[in-house]
UniProtKB/Swiss-Prot annotation:
Motif (HXTX 2): 115-118
HAMAP family for this protein: 2H_phosphoesterase_YjcG (MF_01444)
EC number: 3.1.-.-
Principal EC category: hydrolase
Keyword field contains Hydrolase: yes
Residues at the active site: 34 (proton donor), 115 (proton acceptor)
Molecular function GO terms recorded: hydrolase activity, acting on ester bonds
Matches recorded under SUPFAM superfamilies: LigT-like
Protein source organism: Bacillus cereus (strain ATCC 14579 / DSM 31 / CCUG 7414 / JCM 2152 / NBRC 15305 / NCIMB 9373 / NCTC 2599 / NRRL B-3711)
Keyword set includes Ubl conjugation: no
UniProt-listed PANTHER family: PHOSPHOESTERASE SAOUHSC_00951-RELATED (PTHR40037:SF1), PHOSPHOESTERASE YJCG-RELATED (PTHR40037)
This protein's name: Putative phosphoesterase BC_1225
Family in the record: Belongs to the 2H phosphoesterase superfamily. YjcG family.
């Protein structure tokens, strides 16, 4: 099965991102707007219990924190992905590092850049045009974060929540 680990922002932030994703992200219908803590990875059914237990441990070692989302960025020239920048807090860094060690030893394809994708798969010209327009707009949102989610991919390509993990001691 294919799994992923994410943080979902508030409905207000998701609505703002979805307003752009409808036009600029072909994966719009597959998964809600999110911040990826661990990119999709393959796991066997019998590994699921160990993964869930490890995520409970990680969540209990992480305090709730404030998510800061603002400005539009891009991964160009590596790829034409547009995103809302997410401030790299110590808690986000800790979560990402924990999800790439111990039980989770998958190689990283890219360095950890917390973000909320709003567009991908754009031509170079469309990417430059949209990026230029969005960089002129002022985006800034913040919200408390007290949980993350383990997702799994269904046969039709959509993602759904398998389990939610609350941050902080005594919450799991």
């Amino acid at each position: 099965m294919k799994l992923g680990i994410v943080i979902f922002p508030s409905k207000m932030i998701q609505d703002k991102a979805n307003g752009l994703r409808k036009r600029y992200d072909p994966h719009y219908a597959l998964v809600p707007p999110h911040i990826t803590l661990k990119t999709p990875f393959e796991a066997q059914d019998e590994q699921l219990e160990s993964i869930v237990n490890e995520l409970h441990t990680i969540a209990s070692k992480t305090n709730p924190f404030t998510l800061h989302v603002g400005k539009v960025g891009s991964f160009a020239p590596v790829n034409n992905v547009l995103y809302f920048k997410v401030e790299k807090t110590p808690e986000l860094t800790f979560l990402n590092e924990e999800m790439h060690s111990g039980l989770f030893t998958q190689e990283r394809e890219y360095a950890f850049v917390p973000h909320l994708t709003i567009g991908q798969g754009l031509s170079d010209a469309e990417h430059a045009d949209v990026l230029g327009r969005l960089r002129m707009k002022d985006f800034y949102y913040e919200q408390p974060i007290d949980r993350f989610h383990l997702l799994y991919q269904l046969e039709n390509g959509t993602w759904t929540v398998h389990e939610t993990f609350r941050l902080g001691k005594g919450n799991n």
